[in-house]
């Protein structure tokens, strides 16, 4: 199969992280050959207006208003689709700006898609998330939505232990991959854009809308900060609001009284902890 990537990165005030990954890409001879001969392009959507105009051949920077992750990735998809014929783009990779990347992941993804069987060509590929604080620990290989009560495939596994390797590519039950690193066929991207959630759950809804089972392969991964380090009142707002939207879009059957009870529990917990801003954000989310 002929494979050509558009690597889309939505960036907001992560210049140092981003430039470290770009340096790895530009210094990788195999990736530079793909850029020259196979249409490999890196597209950075700059939501903060802080990046240089150019980082070298094959790297595009698109200044953008701060439209959040949803808007930034959507812009990157649009730019990829506009030039798909020029570059022969077959797949779009969506990657966060605050990950640690090894270019080996891109090599393996290219090899996988080059030899994949026809019946799997339209399936997405989920990149694993390894922990930044314990780098040998896989946090997740792919996700199960479960109505918002997330289940992680291969959750918190120490991948230095042999017993954790035997089923590491098992994707049974997987529904989507997070946009720390995920790859979709251009055929799907060209016709589909993320919901305008600003932050959070855009990757959930997009993957569930695709409906395929994401492929998991060892070595296709990034290191990323896990959710316990990323909590804030604003995040609580988007998580609460967007979860309700996703379930409604999917026509998932759920008990509205149960939803209300869980919401009240969150508000009560925030109130008892004197987290007034979080309490306010949770109220606004509903």
Please provide the spans of the model-predicted regions.
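Hydrophobic targeting segments
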Residues: 4-9, 25, 38-44, 92-94
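Short, well-formed alpha-helical segments that are part of the catalytic scaffolds
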Residues: 14-33
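Short beta-strand-to-loop acidic/aromatic patch adjacent to the donor-nucleotide binding site
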Residues: 86-100
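Conserved donor NDP-sugar-binding/catalytic core segment of glycosyltransferases
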Residues: 104-152
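A recurrent flexible, glycine/aromatic-enriched loop bordering the glycosyltransferase active site
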Residues: 156-181
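Donor nucleotide-sugar recognition loop
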Residues: 173-181, 190-208, 213-222, 232-235
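Catalytic core of nucleotide-sugar-dependent glycosyltransferases
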Residues: 233-257, 277-286
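Non-catalytic, C-terminal membrane-associated alpha-helical segments of glycosyltransferases
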Residues: 262-286
């Amino acid at each position: 199969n002929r494979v050509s990537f558009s690597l889309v990165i939505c960036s907001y005030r992560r210049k140092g992280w981003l430039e470290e990954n770009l340096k790895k890409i530009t210094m990788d001879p195999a990736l530079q050959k793909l850029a020259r001969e196979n249409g490999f392009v890196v597209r950075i959507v700059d939501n903060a207006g802080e990046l240089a105009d150019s980082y070298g051949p094959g790297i595009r920077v698109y200044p953008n208003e701060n439209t959040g992750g949803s808007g930034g990735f959507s812009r990157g998809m649009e730019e990829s689709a506009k030039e798909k014929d020029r570059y022969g783009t077959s797949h779009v990779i969506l990657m966060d700006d605050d990950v640690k990347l090894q270019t080996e992941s891109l090599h393996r993804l290219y090899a996988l898609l080059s030899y994949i069987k026809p019946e799997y060509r339209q399936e997405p590929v989920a990149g694993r998330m390894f922990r930044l604080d314990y780098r040998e620990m896989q946090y997740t290989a792919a996700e199960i939505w479960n109505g918002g009560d997330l289940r992680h495939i291969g959750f918190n596994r120490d991948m230095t232990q042999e017993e954790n390797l035997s089923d590491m590519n098992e994707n049974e039950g997987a529904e989507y991959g997070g946009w720390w690193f995920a790859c979709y066929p251009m055929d799907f991207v060209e016709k589909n854009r993320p919901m305008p959630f600003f932050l959070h759950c855009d990757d959930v809804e997009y993957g569930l809308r695709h409906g395929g089972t994401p492929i998991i392969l060892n070595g296709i991964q990034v290191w990323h900060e896990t959710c316990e380090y990323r909590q804030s009142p604003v995040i609580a707002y988007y998580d609460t609001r967007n979860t309700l939207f996703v379930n409604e879009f999917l026509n998932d059957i759920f008990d509205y009284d149960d939803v209300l009870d869980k919401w009240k529990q969150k508000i009560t917990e925030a109130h008892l902890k004197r987290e007034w801003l979080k309490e306010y954000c949770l109220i606004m989310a509903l």
